[in-house]
Amino acid sequence: MKTIASTALPAHVLQPQYDRQALRSRIVHFGFGAFHRAHQALLTDRVLNAKGGDWGICEISLFSGDTLMSQLRAQDHLFTVLEKGADGNQPIIVGAVHECLNAKLDSLAAIIEKFCEPQVAIVSLTITEKGYCIDPATGKLDTRNERIIHDLEYPDAPHSAPGMLVEALHRRRERGLAPFSVLSCDNIPDNGHVVKNAVLGMAHKRSPELAEWIAANVSFPGTMVDRIVPAATDDSLAEIAREVGVEDPCAISCEPFIQWVIEDNFVAGRPEWEVAGVQMVQDVLPWEQMKLRMLNGSHSFLAYLGYLAGFAHINDCMADSALRDAARRLMLNEQATTLRITGVDLIAYADSLIDRFANPALQHRTWQIAMDGSQKLPQRMLESIRLHLQRDTAWPLLALGVAGWMRYVSGVDDAGNAIDVRDPLSDKIRAIIETSSEEERVAALLALNEIFGHDLPQDPQFVEAITKAYQRISQSGARQAIIDTLSL
């Protein structure tokens, strides 16, 4: 069978210009998903093209991904990233990955031993918020999680990412090997501290002495990641096959824009990511808040309200003047004003986001962005609302965004069509929807302390604003509610 590894590719396809035989598994990565392929793996590939070296990546998947990894092996661990701009496409063959391990294809034991190889300097992760097994109410390890319960009973055969990391560090310590840095690349607030809390929480349960050693010797750099990477579809894979002349089941499409901001705190070295445009900084938090509130907050706003109004893609929302205006006003009037970042032109940043959202080549589905809202709302909207309440400043579009989520999870769009709601709290949410009337809906959903905490549901100003916004959507539909809110 022809693959990208065995076929002469068209001249416009960018290919690795370095010796892939020199690569070693210096980076072990959890989660061979779409975002990692189009972001961290691609940027590491750029460093190798510029500098050469041995910073190869070994991909790890525990309980899924065996088909994808079999396909990756069949094409010498190469895959295609298609950057899709309004002016045309650029296909890139990424060669930084040179090895992969999967629990089903290989074994759990082989995966754990891979972490223990002396050359491993970084363990990176894109496993989504759920993968860290953190209790959202406390920010600490969720000891009720089934995988955590298993790992505490069988620490040498872990099923969770925290369990795997702790067992690997335990073995490295026992063997006198240097520790590695743990690099979360997930789009969650304070991701370095999230993974640190998970690892130290697990280690403390096993051995306080081990936890002390990890705290003293392992670093957990924070990161901010940014690139719009829609999930692969049959159409996107077919388009990539036309571009490169052969099918690539591991391929992914994305926008041309890419940004990675990393806290420069590594205990065992790192690639020279700066040459690929990565920003190495002392404090990631201001960058992270800018992105989560201005980009992700407006993305979620458009996802809920756009989907309700019948818009299938973000670029469809951008073609509507009301939604486009609302997104920009939300960014600048209600989100930018909550930030403490310096040296960044936030008006120019907002304009660049609007241009990126309008990219017709991406076809980023509103339904995809609307997933897992219970885990996204707090950092994307609710943190900003708390600041507005403290300052007594206006936040009508944030209120509409939260109300849009409530209307979306109610399960019916403005045209009366059923919505396939995907959320970690979907069972709880469904029970609330089924047992509350339309008039009771806001109060019933606000009782979800995992999302709203204990403070917001007790704040009369907050409750009134969300209730009015919800009524506006219920009575007039999402698009008209946006128009009415813009005229307030």
Sequence positions of predicted segments:
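Substrate/ligand-engaging "lid" and interaction regions
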Residues: 1-488
